[in-house]
Amino acid sequence: LAGVPGIIRPFRYDGVVHSWWIYSFTIDEGVFGISPREFASALQAEGIPFGCGYIPNPMFDYPVIQERKTYGTSGIPWTLPQARPGIRYSDDDAPNTIWFLSHVLIMSWNEGITESDAMDLAKGIKKVAAWFKENPGSKA
């Protein structure tokens, strides 16, 4: 998908071997004139199983973090000497995280996906991207 206008792929560090369990990317809504959810729907119509959105809330919104709940009674990590108990996180601390969680396009990925499958998926994504680039804001 490198070089496909409007497709923003995950960053990959040189020399790092990835073990994908999901494949994700975002789109430039200005290029396609549609939302990520609409792009995901168009992919699904092509038989490409992408959804839009990851988890509903950032990790710091969950009770395990907010209420410092732990498994058992250890209190770890909040009882460790280096813990900083006064730290609290809010949506204002992570606006990019909030945006990303609702805009990322995601497909489950596993060891059963072959190189041929990956090429077929890329071909379908390119097809949808090309259509919306030529017909921005249109409904597929």
List the predicted regions and their residue ranges.
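PLP-dependent aminotransferase class I/II
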Residues: 1-140
